[in-house]
Amino acid sequence: MITFSDIRIIKPFIKRSNNHTARLTFYTRILLLFILVVSKALAQQSVIKYVQPFSGTSASTTLASQHVEDKTERLANTIPAVAPPFSMTQWTPQTQLSEKKCLAPYYYNNKKFYGIRASHWISGSCTQDYGSFTIMPIAGKLKTNPTDYAVDYTHQEEVATPAYYKTDLPGYNLRTEATATLRCGLIKITALKADSVYLLITPNSDQGKGYIKIDRQKGEISGYNPVHRIYQGWGQPAGFSGYFFIRIKKGFTRSGVFSGGNVSAHQSIENQIDLGAYLGFKLQKGETISIYAGTSFTSIAAAKLNLETELNSANLETIVAKTSRVWEQSLGQVEVKDPNEKNKRIFYTALYHAQQHPRLFNDVDGGYPQFAGNYTKKVLKKDNYYDDFSMWDTYRAQLPLVELLKPNLANDFANSLILKGQQGGWLPIFPCWNNYTAAMIGDHATAFLASAYNKGIRGYDVKEAYRLMRQNAFQMPDSADYLNGKGRRGINSYLKYGYIPMEDSIPDAYHKREQVSRTLEYAYDDYALATVAKDLGKTSDYKQLTERASNYKNVFDQQVGMARGRFADGSWYKPFYPDHREPYITEGTPRQYTFYVPHDVPGLIKLMGGKKNLENELDSLFAKKEYWHGNEPGHQIPFLYNYTYSPWKTQLQVSRILAEEYDEGAGGLSGNDDAGQMSAWYVFAAMGFYPADPVSGNYQLTSPLFTQTVISFNNGKKLTITAIKKTKKSIYSSKITLNGKSFTKNQITHKLLLQGGELIFYLQDQPGMP
């Protein structure tokens, strides 16, 4: 039986005559059979059908978007990525040509299609793509200028799942389909009418670098795109390239290379602006071209090995089904039951976005580029190596979600960070492009490693991890290393004063100044390391780090009741504007950052003069619409009400945020998704708990969004979270039970969650006793 879902998926494949009567061509019937097989497989699956890959690909249309402080933050900057979770390369339709900073490869509202890109874009970020290449099919005459070959497309012709993408290009009468494995992509081009067809293959180097070569006899194309990293606002060579090896399953009649509009019959080209290769075919209606592409960060030979290992000669249908099963298993670790289908779509889309990064970086044989290694190759003996840790964002919820659901993967992440520290000499702060970056603030690789350690995730060299974390916390790199992005920014000032004074402008960083935010976040990282030091019996370190964890108090001005810039002599920065963007605050205001003391909320309460004052300050923040969910430093703020006399306000604000900051459709996210952090917040909050202080292993409770949520843990246990609501509007908890016994705390431990069982929330329409 063909379901409504089937019709929705196959609609773009149905041709209509002038009188709008549907009629299927012979070819379309054949294609329809495949689409029905795929759609039936999806229909039988329980969760992948809810994922909306286009969510976050246009400016936010959520209810809260009108209050966003920085309009550039209205772009979530996700892409409709086709690939398994945490893969090396994501395959995406391309509507933007460049690898420029903050420019995603795909935006929903763009009208022109430029091909399928093998992308290393950090999902939801404001960084840049790197080592990418694009495959563009065209028909008719050969055109090599992007402005000439770009073609109109419509969303009515698009189909997207985590495992499959399809669009028709009416201007060329071509259909483009794509699927992927961890390191490889398979693209299928179908002629909808007889014509000359060309494939354009372009390394996307903005620096006019790169290489591409055609082997006509073997039907193979290979090349590379050298990677550039952002460092202090400009690009530098990253010391490795994005390599590709492509095999075409159809003979081509013509081939050559080009640089912009300059076309040549040569079979290779190197280091030219807008370079690429073209392949020509004569296709009859219904004929196809299958393009098998392997990728690597070490060599063309490795890209070929990855291709032959993962794809070989498999057909599109097989890979779509295989990758769909991988996603089904991964997403299916959390099963939600609820009559609200819209919320399920938002939830599973969030869970999909939260499983894009960190990025797999090694080949099938274990080869990977040495961290900051200038084209040096290393080989793993076991496990996998990962990079692109958007650490300032993801230590808060995205990485804790991995710790909760996939602890073995968290071990790989920890081992990868340790390898980086060993190879580069210092534990990196924000490792992207397999390099030091001096981007963002804090030292949150330490926070992640401590969080994993405290949750019993210890499949790595703990002593070496501690050595590297301690080095960051207690030592200053030499001048050359510091300039290269190693070590904590402003560490000497921080150690001398117990805060970073306004006189230290932090010149050697992408984000300069921001002294108060750095102080607050270093205090948290010191606390994180202190927890590990205590467990390892490092008594002296524990004592010093515990004292330093209170450094947040040194930038809290009790006269104004908020965090504030401070000079070396102890005086305060003037004037003071609590709700303005200030140079000593990172991407926010003093009012917003004042609440960043996740490790010592009782200490913050004391500074503020009691629980009631904390509650009043929180009330004021929300009443002024100063809470900025689109930026990470405030993600723990709604849960601070759990420390006041009115924990029901956590339930109120979290329920409001779930409804106002997230939605369906291309504009469904209210800010940069930042490698899945925004999405991970939704996943946790919808389940009914959140790691406001991930290092502690405690989760703050709130009211669950769904009637029932079942979490399957790696240890074989299951936790069922049930919300028993008096009405559809019930969001306030009157009682909680765990395995039939009353549970009266506002937080729950990681260890207790992993024991499984049933957590029941009894919800009502008003706060207070039932």
Please place each PLM-identified region on the residue numbering:
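Conserved catalytic core of nucleotide polymerization and phosphodiester-bond processing enzymes
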Residues: A723
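Accessory carbohydrate-recognition regions in carbohydrate-active enzymes
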Residues: Q44-A447, Y453-L520, A533-N554, V560, ...
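Bacterial Sec-dependent N-terminal signal peptides
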Residues: M1-Q45
